[in-house]
């Protein structure tokens, strides 16, 4: 097996879809016993908890209109057909990260209209 150079490795990562990158991170976590979560520094608790300005949209359930959900996922993310289909069939799939709350609520409404269930975290 030939060794990849750093440049080749980075180029291969750039070509991966979001789902493939997610699988890669999980495999690295499992293989090396590490976590991709950023270390948290202990700080003083804020005086008042603010509502998050950016959220992550996760698909809980695609519902009966799976074709419509796949089309909506493609529209939102720009994923290819197979990646969008895989995301629609996988419960807990991250549809989009770091979305402004207003935009996330609009996207959630579109999924609700299709009979799908999404979670904003």
Swiss-Prot record:
Superkingdom of origin: Bacteria
UniProt keyword annotation of Cell wall biogenesis/degradation present: no
Molecular functions per Gene Ontology: mRNA binding; structural constituent of ribosome
Pfam family, one: Ribosomal_L12
TM segment ranges: none
Record has Mitochondrion as a keyword: no
Keywords: Ribonucleoprotein, Ribosomal protein
InterPro entries listed in its UniProt record: Ribosomal_bL12 (IPR000206), Ribosomal_bL12_C (IPR013823), Ribosomal_bL12_C/ClpS-like (IPR014719), Ribosomal_bL12_oligo (IPR008932), Ribosomal_bL12_oligo_N_sf (IPR036235)
Any one cellular-component term (Gene Ontology): cytosolic large ribosomal subunit
Gene Ontology biological-process annotations: translation
Subunit structure: Homodimer. Part of the ribosomal stalk of the 50S ribosomal subunit. Forms a multimeric L10(L12)X complex, where L10 forms an elongated spine to which 2 to 4 L12 dimers bind in a sequential fashion. Binds GTP-bound translation factors.
Family: Belongs to the bacterial ribosomal protein bL12 family.
The protein's role, per its UniProt record: Forms part of the ribosomal stalk which helps the ribosome interact with GTP-bound translation factors. Is thus essential for accurate translation.
Name of the protein: Large ribosomal subunit protein bL12
Species assigned in the record: Ureaplasma urealyticum serovar 10 (strain ATCC 33699 / Western)
Classification of source organism: Bacteria, Bacillati, Mycoplasmatota, Mycoplasmoidales, Mycoplasmoidaceae
